[in-house]
């Protein structure tokens, strides 16, 4: 088979050389907003007569490159937009196959690094100390340090990080001690070790006034002190989720499973950084109702972090399997009907994404072609929900959940510590179900994997928990003005928060509604008083799409007081599409841009066609 090319990386491919270990020594400078230090990369040649190699960098200043104590020649290539600049390093000796060399690169990041957000004290809960966090997925690790920034290469790492002594540093690794910085009594050095090989997008760092509380035998929850108690309560189910995940996926090999609750500008719901999952504070609903995100990040400890997509074209392998595991964890905890309820909700989200892109858009394919495309721009619910739908469909085709979970466990065992493509997955599926090849051959593989739009088949879903949401949404959609008095707060008295959210998702698929309906909905249900972020998000979108001017300040507030892109991007888009809030939306974006996460700022700017 031809070699799979990672079009998102400018570095030498895994077939030429492979980074085996990184030792990072760095110092965090909050005044200049830079990370500076040395990255010592242990690189193994994969061919004979290797005389030079290329690494990814982005907005890095390179001070020198040293091999065996000697400075060597290097060339920093021209910037290639979102891909950054390749650095070509000349080797002092030609390497033969499997020979290893340590390359020590002294570097400094840019204050504009796309991987880092630097927060002022005012942007934190405590208001006293600055804060730094990283987000490397998909291709931002190169904006922190020179690397082969591709998920096809896995490495172990160790680190020593110097920070102001009143702050705490954490990484996606096992904590390995702390000591005063011998070079500066006002600083402290934190040490870390990650002994499981990982793709470099899983390297992560946070520095802030962090505290922790133990919530399980292998779990501390970390945050600023203002959020610690609330977070400990919200995520108390973590250990029971981990145990179920081990039952489904095999032993948890990472040792620690800590959680970090970040400041509100964190751009994602969660990030599966090994040993330290990062999560958004928008999960702090007060009733544990958004804990499926924790189940999702836990599941990545197997699908994504152990078995990894070889390139970002195959991102669905990470996310589809992880959503599949996540929903099984929630099913074990809350019942099979609940699993089906969320599965069907996911199909609705897939419909929304396809409607947003357009049904022929290439980003609606399961396997995408990211040649000359920034993965951040292509990102959507498609790899998650189209991927899940394929696995859920296969489950139903091949004999049910137990049968398919058997496949999943075997898949994890087969491909642990490797990076794979969709073809590798499909070949293994066929070999695992070799007695059911006739059934597998009924699958319209080409449409499922490589065609845009909705899948060719919709799986079967148990409707028990969804029916109440549908019937209430249908009542509202069909109601005439005279019927509005028939609604009351009693409509929702038997609804879980998940069902309230699904009801609003149904309404949103039928937006806009007459303004009178929206005002009546607020009168009887008082949705403005609900702080659950998922419910509030859908309610405010429904209000803006139905052109309720009174909701404009509330929607602008939600779009800016947190930065989870799932919420911020659609809210800004809806506000910009409403003539009464268009100018205000653009003005608000411009005012907040400098304090937004760099990726969020870039994508909202694209959405609003600003810049």
UniProtKB/Swiss-Prot annotation:
Keywords: Acetylation, Cytoplasm, Hydrolase, Leukotriene biosynthesis, Metal-binding, Metalloprotease, Phosphoprotein, Protease, Zinc. The keyword Acetylation applies. Inhibited by bestatin. The epoxide hydrolase activity is restrained by suicide inactivation that involves binding of LTA4 to Tyr-379. 4-(4-benzylphenyl)thiazol-2-amine (ARM1) selectively inhibits the epoxide hydrolase activity. GO terms for biological process: leukotriene biosynthetic process; peptide catabolic process; proteolysis. Its EC number is 3.3.2.6, 3.4.11.4. PROSITE patterns: ZINC_PROTEASE (PS00142). SMART domains: Leuk-A4-hydro_C. Monomer. A peptide binds at residues 135-137, 267-272, 564-566. The modification N6-acetyllysine is found at residues 73, 337, 414, 573. This is Leukotriene A-4 hydrolase. It catalyses: leukotriene A4 + H2O = leukotriene B4; (5S,6S)-epoxy-(18R)-hydroxy-(7E,9E,11Z,14Z,16E)-eicosapentaenoate + H2O = resolvin E1; (5S,6S)-epoxy-(18S)-hydroxy-(7E,9E,11Z,14Z,16E)-eicosapentaenoate + H2O = 18S-resolvin E1; Release of the N-terminal residue from a tripeptide. The record marks 379 as: Covalently modified during suicide inhibition by leukotrienes. It comes from the Eukaryota. The active site is at residues 297, 384. The record marks 376 as: Essential for epoxide hydrolase activity, but not for aminopeptidase activity. Bifunctional zinc metalloenzyme that comprises both epoxide hydrolase (EH) and aminopeptidase activities. Acts as an epoxide hydrolase to catalyze the conversion of LTA4 to the pro-inflammatory mediator leukotriene B4 (LTB4). Also has aminopeptidase activity, with high affinity for N-terminal arginines of various synthetic tripeptides. Binds 1 zinc ion per subunit.
């Amino acid at each position: 088979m031809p070699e799979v090319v990672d079009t998102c990386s400018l570095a030498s491919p895994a077939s030429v050389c492979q980074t085996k270990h990184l030792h990072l020594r760095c110092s965090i400078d909050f005044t200049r907003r830079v990370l500076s230090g040395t990255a010592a990369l242990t690189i193994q040649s994969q061919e004979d007569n290797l005389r030079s190699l290329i690494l990814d960098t982005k907005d890095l200043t390179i001070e020198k490159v040293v091999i065996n104590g000697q400075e060597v020649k290097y060339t920093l290539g021209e910037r290639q937009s979102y891909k950054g600049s390749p650095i070509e390093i000349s080797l002092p000796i030609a390497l033969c196959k499997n020979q290893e060399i340590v390359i020590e690169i002294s570097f400094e990041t840019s204050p504009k690094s796309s991987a880092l957000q630097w927060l002022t004290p005012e942007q934190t809960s405590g208001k006293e100390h600055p804060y730094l966090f990283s987000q490397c997925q998909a291709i931002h690790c190169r904006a922190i340090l020179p690397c082969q920034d591709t998920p096809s290469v896995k490495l172990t790492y160790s680190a020593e990080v110097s920070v102001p002594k009143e702050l705490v540093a954490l990484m996606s690794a096992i904590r390995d001690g702390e000591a005063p910085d011998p070079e500066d009594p006002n600083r402290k050095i934190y040490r870390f070790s990650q002994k499981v090989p990982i793709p470099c997008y899983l390297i992560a760092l946070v520095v802030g006034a962090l505290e922790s509380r133990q919530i399980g035998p292998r779990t501390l929850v970390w945050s600023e002190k203002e959020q610690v108690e609330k977070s400990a309560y919200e995520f108390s189910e973590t250990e029971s989720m981990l145990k179920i995940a081990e039952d489904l996926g095999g032993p948890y090999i990472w040792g620690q499973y800590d959680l970090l609750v970040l400041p509100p500008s964190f751009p994602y719901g969660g990030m599966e950084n090994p040993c330290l999952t990062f999560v958004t504070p928008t999960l702090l609903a007060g009733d544990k109702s958004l804990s499926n995100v924790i189940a999702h990040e836990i599941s990545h400890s197997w699908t994504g972090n152990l078995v990894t997509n070889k390139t970002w074209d195959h991102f669905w392998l990470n996310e589809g399997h992880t959503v599949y595991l996540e929903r099984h964890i929630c099913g074990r905890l809350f019942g099979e009907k609940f699993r089906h309820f969320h599965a069907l909700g996911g199909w609705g989200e897939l419909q929304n994404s396809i409607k947003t892109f357009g049904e022929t858009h290439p980003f609606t394919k399961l396997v995408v072609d990211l040649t000359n495309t920034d993965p951040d721009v292509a990102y959507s619910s498609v790899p998650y929900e189209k991927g899940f739908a394929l696995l859920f469909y296969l489950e139903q085709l091949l004999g049910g959940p137990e049968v398919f979970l058997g496949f999943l466990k075997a898949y994890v065992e087969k491909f642990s510590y490797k990076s794979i493509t969709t073809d590798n997955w499909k070949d293994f599926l066929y070999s695992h179900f070799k007695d059911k090849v006739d059934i597998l051959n009924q699958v319209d593989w080409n449409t499922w994997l490589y065609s845009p739009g909705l899948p060719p088949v919709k799986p079967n879903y148990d409707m028990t928990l969804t029916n109440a949401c549908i019937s209430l949404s249908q009542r509202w959609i069909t109601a005439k003005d005279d019927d509005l008095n028939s609604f009351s707060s009693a409509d929702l008295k038997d609804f879980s928060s998940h069902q309230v959210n699904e009801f609003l998702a149904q309404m949103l698929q039928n937006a806009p509604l007459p303004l009178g309906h929206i005002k009546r909905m607020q009168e009887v249900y008082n949705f403005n008083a609900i702080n659950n972020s998922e419910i509030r998000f859908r309610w405010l979108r429904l209000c803006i799409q139905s052109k309720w001017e009174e909701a404009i300040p509330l929607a602008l507030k939600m779009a800016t007081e947190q930065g989870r892109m799932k919420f911020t991007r659609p809210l800004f888009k809806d506000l910009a599409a409403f003539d009464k809030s268009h100018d205000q939306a653009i003005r608000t974006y411009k005012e907040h841009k400098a304090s937004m996460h760099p990726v969020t700022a870039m994508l909202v700017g694209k959405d609003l066609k600003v810049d």
